[in-house]
Amino acid sequence: MDIVKILKKLELEKTGHYENEFYIIDLEDSDEAARAYTKLDKNAVNIEYPCFTVNSNNNTNKVTNYFELESDGNTYLIFLISNYLDDTYYVKIGEKK
């Protein structure tokens, strides 16, 4: 996976780290998460539902936004995770196999 190319396309050029098969980008706060959502919504495609949001555990404390992006014949899964309970926000990017 050419993560630099994907991040550039998503306008999310920020340093992250690998965890298992995902590249994780920690976001500073809910404002940065909102900006990331806007960039993802503009540049990525969710095949089934544009702007589809899943509320984890049927509550609004943790929200996961799911996007897909195709690049060079590969499909990438992108998750924007906002956990309002413990104030953590991050993006996970991985190649769909």
What are the residue ranges of the model-derived segments?
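Mixed-charge, Lys/Arg-enriched low-complexity segments
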Residues: 1-22, 26, 97
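Acidic, low-complexity, intrinsically disordered interaction modules
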Residues: 17-18, 22-92
